[in-house]
């Protein structure tokens, strides 16, 4: 799950760059939402994915 969170975080960042650059103005809002959703998923994956020794 951590791998997927990182992949979608990168996709969201690319979409944000395109959206904020004026290439696709309507994609900026979607990119913000996706970015924060997968940022939360990344944090959850890091915290829950730790193996206790």
From Swiss-Prot:
What NCBIfam families does its record include? PRK13682.1-1, PRK13682.1-3, PRK13682.1-4
Q: Does the keyword Cell membrane apply?
A: yes
GO cellular component annotations, sorted alphabetically?
Answer: plasma membrane
- Entry protein name: UPF0391 membrane protein Patl_1732
Entry's family note:
Belongs to the UPF0391 family.
Q: What organism is recorded for this protein?
A: Pseudoalteromonas atlantica (strain T6c / ATCC BAA-1087)
Record's keyword annotation contains Membrane? yes
List the taxonomic lineage.
Bacteria, Pseudomonadati, Pseudomonadota, Gammaproteobacteria, Alteromonadales
Q: What is the membrane topology here?
A: Multi-pass membrane protein
The protein's UniProt keywords, in alphabetical order, are:
Cell membrane, Membrane, Transmembrane, Transmembrane helix
- Which InterPro entries does this chain map to? DUF1328
Q: Which residues cross the membrane?
A: 4-24, 28-48
Q: What is its main location?
A: membrane
Instruction: State the compartments where it is located.
Output: Cell membrane
């Amino acid at each position: 799950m951590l791998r997927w969170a990182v992949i979608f975080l990168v996709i969201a960042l690319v979409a944000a760059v395109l959206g904020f650059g004026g290439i696709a103005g309507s994609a900026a809002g979607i990119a913000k939402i996706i970015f924060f959703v997968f940022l939360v998923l990344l944090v959850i994956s890091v915290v829950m994915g730790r193996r206790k020794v």
